[in-house]
Amino acid sequence: MTLTRRQLVAAFPAAIAAGLPRAARAEGGRRVVTFWFGQANSDGQAALRNDLVEAFNVSQDKYLLQLEVKGAAVNNLLKIALLAGNGPDIVQTAGPAYLTAIANAGQVLPLDDFAEKYKWKERFLPALLNTSVYGGKLYALPRDYESMHLFYNKDLFKQNGWKQPTNRADLEAIAEAALAEGIVPFGAGNADWKGVNEWLMTVFFNNVAGPDNVRKALSGELPWTAQPFVEAVELSKAWFNKGYFGKNYFSLTVEQSFLQVVNGKAAMALSGTWAFGTKSYGMSKPDTVMDVMSVPTLGSAFTGSLVHLACGATLSIAKNSQNPEGAAAVFEFMLTRKFYETMNRDWPGKWALPIKDLSPEMLRGIGFPLFETTIASLHDAFSKGQYGFTTWTFWPGATNSYLIEGIEQVWLNKITPDAYLTRMQTLFSQEAKEGKVPPLPPRAA
């Protein structure tokens, strides 16, 4: 039976009812592959529907991909479903820090056989692929690669004679000048996503303490209570209390706060490459007011600027999946050039698969110059081992949860930086003993 275009599109929002038997379902002679996705705005949902679900379903006649957008609750829903032996065939997590728990619990399949069949290990950047290797086995593919960046309103910079900052002194000079003009230095808000806290702390830990010290701490060679990390937390508190992140951090959403920069109400934003995927920011337009750069040093540990190695999401196959071959076929489809170009054109930054062979022609096919140059520079830095470490990729789960929640207590003067880091070290030590710290990529030669 050949499905019509309408039938294929209809498969996108198909409900995946709780408690369905685990036997693989079939529709129209095809074996169904189920996939739950987290948050996606209207542009993202359209890209998922057109560039992934429909495109995969028309590319072959053996499997039928059904995807359901679950929203912010997806992590909890997945956790419950996996414990019950139900849930989707394709398991997406919010990064290796989240993958560790389900891999250790045996809730996802090793992908080594599929990796050998499809030559995945030869096609992905090792620094990203290795973040999903536990006990010598590959449990996930990285869906994307990300980094924190400094986005800024280039028109506002020009009007005020501000130059690209190269160090902490430069950044703080711009911040103070902005405050004097009634401009928010950094557009920021976590009303709809507490994870903004860890975006900022990724920058402070790496750009103050330095990536070498962060690596040592993640390896257990240096405690989180060491002075470089105290200085990082103290600087984050100082900036928050000076008003560098505005007066409405807890009431503004991510989009509202970034639009402050676009509209000239704020000068800069510390955000990630995923920001390219929000069309309201207008960064794909030739006349965009926005520009972007890597984040400059904020301490004495290094000079210059730094990108931060991140895998924003991982893709695994559930242990109880009755259609692992179909799920692997979806992964293989995601590695096609057409998918890379169309998905990154329609939803930039959300599906920048960390493939080794990222040709200039592929990037030009996206048609988004600012995104293309940023991704190309990231690809180069990650290939050469020149990067810091993001919390959502390399911190273990409980430690990272406390990092996010506890830092607000520091900023609001309820606990000291020392108390915050002492608690973090306690949690980290316990998780390290339990083997829950995500693997680190090898040091660059």
PLM regions: where:
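Hinge/lid segment of periplasmic solute-binding proteins
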Residues: A94-H149, E172, A178, N197-M201, ...
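Glycine-centered hinge/linker elements that transmit conformational signals in sensory
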Residues: E176, L218-Y249, V295
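Short, solvent-exposed loop/beta-turn-alpha elements that line the ligand-binding surface or hinge
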Residues: D112-F124, N190, N207-E231, Y281-K285, ...
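Short helix-initiation/N-cap motifs at beta->coil->alpha
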Residues: V69-L77, R168-D170, Y249-V262
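A structural signal for short loop-to-beta-strand junctions that line the ligand-binding cleft
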Residues: P88-D89, Y118-D155, V184-A188, F302-H308, ...
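Conserved N-terminal structural module of periplasmic/extracytoplasmic solute-binding proteins
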Residues: T2-T4, V9-T100, N104-A105, F114-Y118, ...
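C-terminal lobe and pocket-closing loops
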Residues: P96, A275-P286, G299-Y402, V437-A445
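Extracytoplasmic/periplasmic solute-binding protein
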Residues: G135, Y139-R143, M148, E172-L222, ...
